Design a protein with these regions (language model features):
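ATP-dependent carboxylate activation and anion-phosphoryl transfer catalytic cores
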Residues: 2-5, 16-17, 30
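Structural detector for hydrophobic anchor residues on beta-strands
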Residues: 6, 22, 32-34
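Short, charged low-complexity linear motifs
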Residues: 7-12, 39
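Short aromatic-glycine-(Arg/Gly/Cys) micro-motifs in beta-strand/loop hairpins
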Residues: 10-27
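ATP/adenylate-binding site constellation spanning eukaryotic-like Ser/Thr protein kinases
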Residues: 26-29, 47
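A short, exposed loop/beta-hairpin motif centered on an aromatic-Gly-Thr core
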Residues: 30-41
Length: 84
């Protein structure tokens, strides 16, 4: 089992209707981004988006990107990541 840790960017934004929002994305995964009403929601949605993105890569036979310079770390054992 491998664990992958992806760096995320989270910034204040707004929805199309002007309501406050947070935009979250992973720089190493082109096009993998989402929004939420608060930071926690945006990060939770990003976690789901990353899982779906990686599922699509695996289904297509593509490798999961590993590039520490772009914020992607692979570990050869299970890991727990805690955001504080």
């Amino acid at each position: 089992m491998q664990s992958h840790i992806f760096s995320a960017v989270l910034e204040a934004d707004q929805f199309e209707d002007g309501a406050p929002a947070f935009h979250a994305w992973c720089p190493a995964l082109k096009g993998c981004h989402t929004w939420g009403h608060n930071q926690q929601e945006a990060l939770a949605r990003l976690e789901e988006a990353v899982e779906l993105y990686l599922d699509d890569l695996r289904a297509a036979g593509e490798p999961i990107p590993v590039d520490p310079e772009r914020g992607v770390i692979a570990l050869s054992s299970p890991a727990v990541v805690v955001n504080l």
